[in-house]
Design a protein with these regions (language model features):
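A short, charged, amphipathic alpha-helix used as a generic interaction element across diverse proteins
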Residues: 22-59
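Short aromatic-glycine-(Arg/Gly/Cys) micro-motifs in beta-strand/loop hairpins
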Residues: 1-28
Length: 94
């Protein structure tokens, strides 16, 4: 999904950060109203070493889209703008 589509999707979507808590298959989810908030939580969880993904959920259309790549790009962009190093977990992803 590109940024134009993501921006259009933001009008009706909520964002779910899925957190995989290990091999037991038990995880959790955290729903956010904004993509930026979801990216903050995703970044934090990845820093803690919890494998996570970000999904846009459009309750109006009943659709979902994996937007983890867009979350990674936003976090990299933030690091670049702030002139800080990428998180270690993100270096291996990009």
């Amino acid at each position: 999904m590109n940024y134009d589509k993501l921006n259009a999707y933001k009008l009706t979507a909520r964002y779910l950060v899925l957190i995989d808590c290990g091999s037991d298959g038990i995880g959790s989810g955290d729903i956010h109203a904004s993509f930026d908030d979801a990216c903050d939580v995703y970044d934090c969880q990845m820093d803690f070493g919890d494998a996570s993904t970000v999904h846009a959920i459009d309750f109006t259309d009943g659709t979902t889209q994996d937007v983890t790549a867009e979350a990674n790009a936003l976090i990299a962009k933030r690091c670049n703008e702030r002139a800080v190093d990428l998180p270690t977990w993100l270096e291996g992803v990009l």
